[in-house]
From Swiss-Prot:
It comes from the Bacteria. PANTHER family: CELL DIVISION PROTEIN WHIA-RELATED (PTHR37307:SF1). InterPro entries: Homing_endonucl, Sporu_reg_WhiA_N_dom, Sporulation_regulator_WhiA, Sporulation_regulator_WhiA_C, WhiA_LAGLIDADG_dom. It comes from Thermoanaerobacter pseudethanolicus (strain ATCC 33223 / 39E) (Clostridium thermohydrosulfuricum). This is Probable cell division protein WhiA. Involved in cell division and chromosome segregation.
Amino acid sequence: MSFSSDTKDELARIYPEEEESKIAELAALIRTIGSISMYGNGKISLTFTTENASVARLVFKLIKDLFGIIPETMVRRGRYLKKTLSYLIFVPDTKIAEEILGKVKILNYEKGHIKLNYGIDQKIVKNSKAKKAYLRGAFLGGGSISDPEKAYHMEFITHNLEHGKDLSKLINSFDLNSKVIARKNNYVVYLKEGEQIVDVLNIMGAHSALLNLENIRVYKEMRNNVNRIVNCETANLTKTINASLRQIESINYIKETVGLDYLPPNLKEVAELRINYPDLSLKELGQMLVPPVGKSGVNHRLRKIEEISKKLKERRVQ
């Protein structure tokens, strides 16, 4: 199972205690996996469709507890290449469907006409627990999280721009920074920062998923730090090797053309050590001198040797 599926299974096991929270969560589920069918003579039915059995059980229980009815259920297997199971929760009775849609503030009657509310009615998210329940329902119905090993991305898919904007505002009321974009015929509310995704998981109550994500974040950060250190040390080592090769080349040129006795005693001493110990660092070379010399002092002498080699080459060309 994916990280996203595991998170949904965890969230679907959380059952709200307060009626306000139950209504809020059901409202979000209707917005994301619910469909309202309107027929002639003012008949209405309500259907939920999901591929997650845990989500289907949650919808069934919410409707049963809030409205005292047993909704119809059906399991359908996909055709052709897609053989996954779909779970349908069906409320065919117009009176009950209207009661549910009215309770969650999606359906209103104005002057004898039915009016659909596409946004989130503030009356159903008037407290913190209800907001969290709504967010949980929105994720269970239309949310997903990418594999945190690869990228940090959480999104909520909704079919309506007004609902997308309201959902983004609800998320951002917890000091987060979600954004809304259009994608094909839907709208996507998304977050891309690991820290903010952790916050959303905490808000929804997905504590196991949160801990897993935090562990992955810590591991990735440690791995990145190690890689940076290794890259830095590799770069420094390459720089040291290149400098050593350049210095040895200069010393050998002096040795082959005029001899090392051409150099002042202090430079000759360093030159001989560098040839005999090509792998030593400047600090280690300095410790072998009598008296010992610091890293900057050794570097200064070797640069002097390179300058002498360069002048000898220029003189030879002339």
